[in-house]
Amino acid sequence: MSRLLIDIGNTRLKWAWCDDAPVAAEHVVEGGAVLPSPWRHGGAAAHAVPAERSALVGTWRQLAAGTTPEIWIANVAGPTIAAAMEAVMEDAFGAVSPHWVRTTAAHGDLVNGYREPTQLGVDRWVGSIGAHRWLPGETLLIVTAGTATTLDIVTATADGARFEGGLILPGLELMLGTLARNTAQLPELDVLDTGAGAERAVRALGADNTHDAIAAGCLAAQAGAIERSWRALAGRGPVRCLLSGGARHAVAGALAMPFEMHDNLVLLGLHAMALPA
């Protein structure tokens, strides 16, 4: 059976096409991140750009070769984008009945510890499922550096694992943009402006120019939240930090703690949910 997995974030979507056929080892890892196995194809697109959505139609139609895959989707971009993606899928496959994943109180041996489980964002929940699948039995700090930066904690328990909760703060690009828009004389920077000078300034606790001072200040805020959470968890026992999201490379340069890059946790979680129980 072929499966199409789609992770729709606030600005971009990522997708994976996998099936039950054997797969060569080189297809299992892409960009340093483990992908669902068997994994055949994958990609990304800016979902608000019609041309990029249209390009998906041809790609998916070719992969389907006249069949209709089982489709699993985690969407945090809202109903307008959901409707647009429904149209893309219908163009590619004809009539479809995708599984729009929702947050639940538990999945397998992972328990959702939110006071109101359905309030937890579906991306955070499915990403936690993927992280737990990837590293079962481990206590995890899952950091997603995207439009928002989220820090989520999964702890190992005697009979499985528990999603404990986490933190949400403005993402790096939001911090940079908000500072510029709400001040009269500070320039607007983007994530690509947070380079080596900003990283040095974070470590030196100061910058000798405004550009690096802004970039380093926002990086230090991101790194400070992550490192504080990591230290608190490390004080209880072993913990592994998984770093993902579009700004992960910029944030990584400011961290003074061990971490691992893994940018496909939501796709891994969708794959786990799609497999028969």
Curated annotation (Swiss-Prot):
Substrate binds at Y114, G121, V122, D123, R124, T210. The active site is at D123 (proton acceptor). ATP binds at D7, I8, G9, N10, T11, R12, L13, K14, T147. It is found in: Cytoplasm. Pathway: Cofactor biosynthesis; coenzyme A biosynthesis; CoA from (R)-pantothenate: step 1/5. Its EC number is 2.7.1.33. A monovalent cation. Ammonium or potassium. GO terms for molecular function: ATP binding; pantothenate kinase activity. Its main location: cytoplasm. It catalyses: (R)-pantothenate + ATP = (R)-4'-phosphopantothenate + ADP + H(+). SUPFAM superfamilies: Actin-like ATPase domain. GO terms for cellular component: cytoplasm. InterPro entries: ATPase_NBD, Type_III_PanK. Disulfide bonds: none annotated. Its cofactor is NH4(+); K(+). Keywords: ATP-binding, Coenzyme A biosynthesis, Cytoplasm, Kinase, Nucleotide-binding, Potassium, Transferase. Pfam families: Pan_kinase (PF03309). One of its GO terms (biological process) is coenzyme A biosynthetic process. Catalyzes the phosphorylation of pantothenate (Pan), the first step in CoA biosynthesis. HAMAP family: Pantothen_kinase_3 (MF_01274). Homodimer. Belongs to the type III pantothenate kinase family. This is Type III pantothenate kinase.
